[in-house]
Amino acid sequence: MARRCAAIAYAVRMEAGQHAEDMPRRALVFGGSGQIGERLLAGLLADGWRVQAVSRAPRAAAPGLSWRQGDLSGDWRDDGPFDAVFSCGPLDHFARWYQAADIAAPRVVAFGSTSVEVKQDSHEPAERDVARRLREAEAALFAAARARGAAATVLRPTLVYGAGRDATLTAIARLATRSGVFVLPAGADGLRQPVHVQDLADAALQVLRHPATAGHAYALGGGERLAYAEMVRRVLASLQPPPRLLRVPAPLFRGALAMAHAIGRLRGMNAAALARMREPLVFDIDPARRDFGYAPRPFHPTRDMFGL
């Protein structure tokens, strides 16, 4: 009952735009050392929050920021109450922890992935399992939040870039820089919505000010839809000197990929991933625009966004 009353009072204050100095502003952050988490920590501190972040490795404290060594699998001693809990790491791990933890926080914001939709009908069993775990984690998180009177929101990024730590566009940039060329199969023109890490961190803060986001999951794509090949062209154009983009027939590309697999390389590029290059993987971001003013930037990459 106490948690439910706290959640209601918090939502009323946030909806009214009240940010009184005596209003507690403590955040607990998981995944704060990751590419999204680093930007989120900076945003919270700039906004005057006191933050406790969790990390497996020891980290130095900073003004307004303390680090707690641990992870989501160990025993939890509540250092709350917190005004908000953020998760920028694996959603399934966080959902299990949240179900079991006796944490007092009226607001929960967790990052998931659009893979919950993209991979649910994949030909690859491992990818279908990823989608299943994400779907079940979202449901578990929302149910646990409702049971304790908290307001939970899930944010589903598309193709993330901007910190030089992503597994797709940064990998493309680095491979192309080393070789001077990047090869794509003909027909790799499925639409994409690359999204900058800063826009994701900003979104996590924005939802706190909008109680209507409680109980909802939002797709967070970038501000522009473009073909896969055009996306790669822009990545290459941002590099110095710009590597060349080479389009080859799809059968030739598949043969080269099979040889790479045979020597233990490019394992992440399976048949399903290759097929998705031709498929439109775009999502409706209008609900996020409407509910909390989401305004992502168009895709204009620069070299530093890939850590180069």
Task: Give residue spans per PLM region.
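NAD(P)H-binding glycine-rich loop region in Rossmannoid oxidoreductase-like domains
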Residues: L65-P106, A110, T114-P125
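Alpha-helical membrane-targeting segments
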Residues: A171-P194, P242-L281
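Conserved SDR Rossmann-fold cofactor-binding beta-strand/turn motif
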Residues: R156-P157, Y161
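Active-site Tyr-X1-5-Lys
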Residues: D129-T153
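N-terminal Rossmann NAD(P)H-binding glycine-rich loop of SDR-like oxidoreductase domains
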Residues: L28-L45
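Substrate-positioning beta->alpha
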Residues: D166-A171, A186-L208, G215-A219
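N-terminal Rossmann-fold cofactor-binding loop
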Residues: V54-P58
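Mid/C-terminal beta-alpha module of Rossmann-like enzyme folds, strongest
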Residues: V207-M269, I285, R290-L308
